[in-house]
């Protein structure tokens, strides 16, 4: 049943994090319903277990880039499950804007990126907060906003260059793998920088 499926999924994630799950979590984690629900990825993530856990879902008026970003900011979205095209496009647009800056500003931006990656490598959770709320506060105010905790991707790989650009902003990007016949079969929810930049799909679900 739906409750059992939810508990199995949560238990696997907690096992990966090295924690012991002692009770069920009925959260208020706002999830962006980005994926079509008639697709196996959307069905098995936005419907099962997200909806069955009681988490509120945010629906898009359309899938224009600005609509996605504005919706996330206004509705304070915390979790996005999508395909790599989302962050690839965002990273490319960011790089294009940076390339138009003056040379000193470009160097300053790159220095902030390197600083952010270094802090997150040493202190993943705290580093993400610092990157999101301090180093790139003004940038994130124009993107997903400060509330977004995780972007879970599936369906394809993403270039490391794009993963690094998004990670530097303080957003945690993770990957999973699945097929139409089996739904989600693997997931990597690690927050350390090495795992986030590897693009690894993680361990097989039990």
Language model features: what each stretch is:
Residues 1, 46-47, 62, 163-166:
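Composition- and surface-driven signal marking solvent-exposed, interaction-prone regions
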Residues 58-59, 124-127, 141, 146-154, ...:
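Conserved ATP-binding loop and adjacent catalytic segment of the adenylate-forming AMP-binding
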């Amino acid at each position: 049943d739906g409750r059992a499926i939810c508990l199995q999924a949560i238990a696997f994630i907690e096992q990966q994090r090295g924690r012991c799950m002692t009770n069920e979590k009925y959260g208020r984690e706002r999830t962006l319903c980005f994926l079509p629900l008639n697709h196996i990825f959307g069905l098995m993530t936005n419907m099962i277990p997200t909806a069955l856990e009681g988490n509120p879902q945010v629906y898009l008026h359309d899938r224009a880039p600005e609509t996605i970003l504005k919706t996330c900011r206004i509705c304070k979205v915390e979790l996005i499950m999508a395909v790599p095209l989302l962050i690839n496009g965002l990273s490319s647009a960011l790089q294009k804007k940076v390339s138009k800056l003056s040379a000193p500003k470009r160097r300053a931006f790159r220095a902030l990126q390197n600083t952010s990656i270094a802090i997150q490598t040493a202190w993943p959770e705290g580093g993400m907060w610092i990157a999101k709320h301090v180093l790139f506060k003004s940038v994130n105010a124009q993107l997903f906003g400060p509330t977004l905790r995780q972007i879970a991707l599936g369906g394809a790989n993403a270039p490391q260059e794009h993963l690094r650009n998004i990670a530097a902003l303080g957003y945690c990007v993770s990957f999973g793998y699945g097929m139409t016949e089996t739904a989600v079969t693997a997931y990597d929810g690690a927050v350390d920088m090495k795992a986030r930049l590897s693009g690894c799909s993680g361990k097989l679900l039990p």
